């Protein structure tokens, strides 16, 4: 029973870490990367659709991203979605391809991005701690109903803490790597 609770908690924490990783990859660093725009939602046929489902995205050099839609009719919708996003990029539409010039980040914008990374990282850690709390509550209920012993509860809580610490360390590393990337000029 405890193993099931631990496995369920581990899956939830891994999912939370994946979401954090995706969100951090979408934060602009002054260097072009398709991940910067691929998850921006575009209103296409009445359905919000990620850009990477509508077009090929390439980063031919460190300062440019090109977006080539498979259906040219969605060019203006992609352009509008990019302008609405909080990336601060101005799309250049030539009728076939959208080009995005990635200007170097100002020091002020760099600091804003670092704060955004820290905030997102803290939210993720809170989510992981909530998963831990829920799992502990489940184990305490089992102990209270005499389905597991106090020793099992102690062992389970120790294992749960190790799992939580491991995932929080991974999240911290993702955040630190992104901050380092943002600080590079």
Swiss-Prot record:
Could you cite one Gene Ontology molecular function of this protein? ribosomal large subunit binding
A single Pfam family, by name? RRF
Principal subcellular localisation of the protein: cytoplasm
InterPro entries (alphabetical): Ribosome_recyc_fac (IPR002661), Ribosome_recyc_fac_dom (IPR023584), RRF_sf (IPR036191)
A single cellular component GO annotation: cytoplasm
HAMAP family, sorted:
RRF
Where does it reside? Cytoplasm
**What are the record keywords, sorted?**
Cytoplasm, Protein biosynthesis
The signal peptide stretch is none
Matching NCBIfam families, A to Z? frr (TIGR00496)
What's this protein's name?
Ribosome-recycling factor
Q: Membrane-spanning residues where?
A: none
Fetch the SUPFAM superfamilies from UniProt. Ribosome recycling factor, RRF (SSF55194)
Q: Which family does it belong to?
A: Belongs to the RRF family.
GO biological process terms held by the UniProt record = translational termination
């Amino acid at each position: 029973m405890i193993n099931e609770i631990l496995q369920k908690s581990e899956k939830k924490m891994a999912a939370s870490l994946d979401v954090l990783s995706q969100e951090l990859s979408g934060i602009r660093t002054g260097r072009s990367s398709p991940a910067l725009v691929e998850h921006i939602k575009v209103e296409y046929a009445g359905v919000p659709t990620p850009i990477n489902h509508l077009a090929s995205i390439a980063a031919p050099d460190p300062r440019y991203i090109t977006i080539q839609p498979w259906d040219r009719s969605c060019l203006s919708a992609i352009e509008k979605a990019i302008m609405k996003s909080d990336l601060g990029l101005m799309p250049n539409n030539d009728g076939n391809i959208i080009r995005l010039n990635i200007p170097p980040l100002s020091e002020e914008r760099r600091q804003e991005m670092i704060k955004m990374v820290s905030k997102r990282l803290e939210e993720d850690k809170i989510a992981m701690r909530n998963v831990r709390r829920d799992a502990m509550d489940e184990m305490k209920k089992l102990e209270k109903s005499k389905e597991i012993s106090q020793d099992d509860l102690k062992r389970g809580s120790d294992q749960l803490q190790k799992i939580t610490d491991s995932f929080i360390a991974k999240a911290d590393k993702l955040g630190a790597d992104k901050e380092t990337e943002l600080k590079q000029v």
